[in-house]
């Protein structure tokens, strides 16, 4: 394998609708020693790309900064809600030099707040602007549903993200988890097909946008 994904923690400072990880509770953690052991052992056969999910990885930012500083021949990508990113955080990222980020967003304004909580969209925009101003590498993690799949692939949305410094989008389709999950938000076959063609259109050499889009499920081929 050339990439490894691990969860530093199951803890999160938000409680998003339909978040699969929420079903695991918020008390599970890997110690720094555990994470260091994982990376050390995986570097030996040549794995140098690590994705950190959760939970919210930035809840463990000090340990992750320490981990990245120790393993300078590897790269660490964090999936984050972006709400814990401030100038001090950006300064630390620049110090270690081998971290990048996928910031979660579901659309413009209320489209994000309805799932993640009031005010989260503005906090995400602030985090993006800080990261852009500090020259950091980041993209988005977008959960698309039957309600937002066209909005989060629209030209307006793409142009907005590009203006805030986003370099890539990683799309995941909605998966209903738990007793209270809304199955109506699942995409049907026609909507899935739309996403297949639209993502390829956005990243096309002709008529595309200067942003790289990946669809986790539909690009699995």
What are these regions (language model features)?
Residues 3-33:
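Canonical Radical SAM [4Fe-4S] cluster-binding loop centered on the CxxxCxxC motif
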Residues 8, 59, 177-179:
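Flexible loop/turn segments at secondary-structure boundaries
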Residues 13, 21, 72-73, 117, ...:
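Residue-level recognition of short, structured coil/turn motifs
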Residues 22-26, 108-111, 176-179:
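A short, flexible beta-alpha/helix-coil linker loop
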Residues 23-28, 114-120, 184-187:
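Short glycine-enriched, charge-decorated loop/helix-capping segments at active-site entrances
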Residues 32-52, 60-173:
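Radical SAM/AdoMet-radical enzyme domain recognition
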Residues 174-221:
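A C-terminal junction/extension of Radical SAM enzymes
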């Amino acid at each position: 394998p050339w990439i490894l994904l691990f969860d530093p923690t199951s803890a999160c400072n938000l409680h998003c609708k339909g978040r699969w990880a929420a079903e695991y509770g918020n008390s599970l953690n890997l110690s720094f020693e555990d994470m260091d052991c994982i990376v050390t052992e995986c570097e030996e056969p040549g794995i140098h790309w690590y994705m950190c999910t959760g939970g919210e990885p930035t809840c463990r930012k000090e340990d992750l900064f320490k981990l990245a500083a120790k393993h300078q021949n590897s790269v660490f990508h964090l999936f984050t809600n972006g709400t814990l990113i401030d100038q001090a955080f950006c300064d630390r990222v620049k110090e270690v030099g081998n971290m990048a980020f996928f910031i979660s967003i579901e659309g413009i304004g209320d489209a994000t707040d309805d799932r993640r909580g009031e005010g989260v969209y503005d906090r995400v925009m602030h985090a993006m602007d800080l990261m852009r101003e500090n020259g950091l590498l980041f993209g988005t993690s977008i959960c698309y549903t039957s309600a937002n799949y066209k909005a989060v692939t629209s030209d307006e949305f793409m142009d907005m993200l590009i203006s805030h410094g986003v370099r890539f989008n990683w799309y995941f389709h909605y998966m209903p988890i738990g007793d209270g999950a809304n199955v109506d938000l699942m995409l049907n076959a026609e909507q899935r097909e739309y996403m297949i063609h639209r993502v390829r259109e956005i990243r096309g050499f002709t008529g595309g946008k200067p942003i790289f889009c990946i669809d986790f499920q539909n690009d699995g081929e």
